[in-house]
């Protein structure tokens, strides 16, 4: 009796750049607000829903399909973070729920900081670019939490915004580096591979 073996090959694209770009671009735009460049507006909320939220969720589901636990957890979690942040803002603006006070927001942001700090440990086995993204994001969440907890003034909030802009651009770099490196079949923008 002849037995045939069929081998299935994964031919789907790399979803990580989509997730990193969704996170990075939305983070830059929100932190331009935090840095005092412009007021909170519908552009930031729309980016939070669509690119920061939905695009990262799509990337997370695609990473799940590829069996990548780290990326699945990261993209789904941060996609849902963006949706929850927009929901917090919109519910209060519509008068459907009370806005969280500074202590509540500090707790919310600190929990995300703790989660991100643990995820940062995972990047120590991946690459330097992701270490920069997750390291700077950990700092950003804790700065935001501290700012809300102590009722920080504009100077502290603007400084935090600049740190967030750096974090967002580091994610944009990591995402675009993966795209260009794949397209050219060589290292165009280095990610700083970690020796295992």
Which residue ranges define each predicted feature?
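N-terminal topogenic module of multi-pass integral membrane proteins
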Residues: 1-59, 63
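Helix-adjacent hinge/juxtasegments
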Residues: 72, 80-107
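Juxtamembrane loop-transmembrane helix junctions in multi-pass integral membrane proteins
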Residues: 7-14, 36-43, 65-69, 96-103, ...
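Short, highly charged, low-complexity non-transmembrane loops/tails of multi-pass membrane proteins
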Residues: 185-196
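C-terminal ends of transmembrane helices
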Residues: 56-66, 118-125
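Cytoplasmic-side transmembrane-helix entry/capping segments in multi-pass membrane proteins
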Residues: 69-78, 129-136
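Alpha-helical membrane segments in multi-pass integral membrane proteins
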Residues: 107-118, 128-149, 156-177
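Structural signature of hydrophobic alpha-helical transmembrane segments
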Residues: 40-53, 99-111, 134, 161-165
């Amino acid at each position: 009796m002849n037995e045939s073996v069929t081998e299935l090959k994964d031919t789907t694209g790399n979803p990580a750049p989509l997730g990193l770009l969704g996170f990075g671009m939305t983070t830059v735009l929100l932190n331009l607000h935090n840095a005092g460049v412009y007021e909170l507006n519908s552009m930031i909320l729309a980016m939070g829903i669509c690119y920061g939220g939905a695009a990262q969720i799509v990337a997370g589901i695609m990473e799940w399909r590829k069996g990548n636990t780290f990326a699945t957890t990261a993209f789904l979690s941060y996609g849902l973070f963006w949706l929850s942040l927009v929901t917090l803002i919109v519910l209060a603006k519509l008068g459907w729920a009370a806005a969280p006070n500074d202590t509540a927001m500090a707790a919310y942001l600190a929990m995300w900081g703790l989660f991100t700090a643990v995820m940062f440990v995972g990047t120590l086995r991946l690459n330097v670019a992701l270490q920069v993204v997750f390291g700077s994001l950990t700092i950003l969440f804790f700065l935001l939490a501290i700012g809300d907890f102590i009722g920080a003034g504009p100077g502290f909030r603007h400084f935090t915004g600049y740190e967030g802009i750096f974090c967002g651009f580091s994610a944009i770099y990591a995402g675009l580096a993966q795209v260009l490196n794949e397209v050219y079949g060589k290292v165009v923008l280095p990610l700083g591979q970690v020796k295992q």
